[in-house]
Amino acid sequence: MALTQTRKQEIINQYQAHGTDTGSADLQVALLTERINQLTTHLQANPKDHASRRGLLQLIGRRRGLLSYIQKKDFQRYQDLIGRLGIRR
């Protein structure tokens, strides 16, 4: 279920703010979104996996908190990010 190292590096390269950025809020949201998408497909194939469903809800909550932070700090950056990630909120 975890992200492969190559996929994680692709996401980091795509969303990092500068060359050494590995933990900005935008990047964290992008990584969480990828994990959420993977878990969603897993749960569609395994609907009785309640432990994974709980983990999914925790990830969604963490992403929601980061998105709220970005929205408060810079609304335009927030709009761009949800547009790039395809998140409806």
UniProtKB/Swiss-Prot annotation:
InterPro entries: Ribosomal_uS15, Ribosomal_uS15_bac-type, uS15_NS1_RNA-bd_sf. One of its GO terms (molecular function) is rRNA binding. One of its GO terms (cellular component) is cytosolic small ribosomal subunit. Pfam families: Ribosomal_S15. It comes from the Bacteria. Keywords: Ribonucleoprotein, Ribosomal protein, RNA-binding, rRNA-binding. The keyword Ribosomal protein applies. GO terms for biological process: translation. Part of the 30S ribosomal subunit. Forms a bridge to the 50S subunit in the 70S ribosome, contacting the 23S rRNA. PANTHER family: RIBOSOMAL PROTEIN S15, BACTERIAL AND ORGANELLAR, SMALL RIBOSOMAL SUBUNIT PROTEIN US15M. Belongs to the universal ribosomal protein uS15 family. HAMAP family: Ribosomal_uS15_B (MF_01343_B). One of the primary rRNA binding proteins, it binds directly to 16S rRNA where it helps nucleate assembly of the platform of the 30S subunit by binding and bridging several RNA helices of the 16S rRNA. This is Small ribosomal subunit protein uS15. It comes from Gloeothece citriformis (strain PCC 7424) (Cyanothece sp. (strain PCC 7424)).
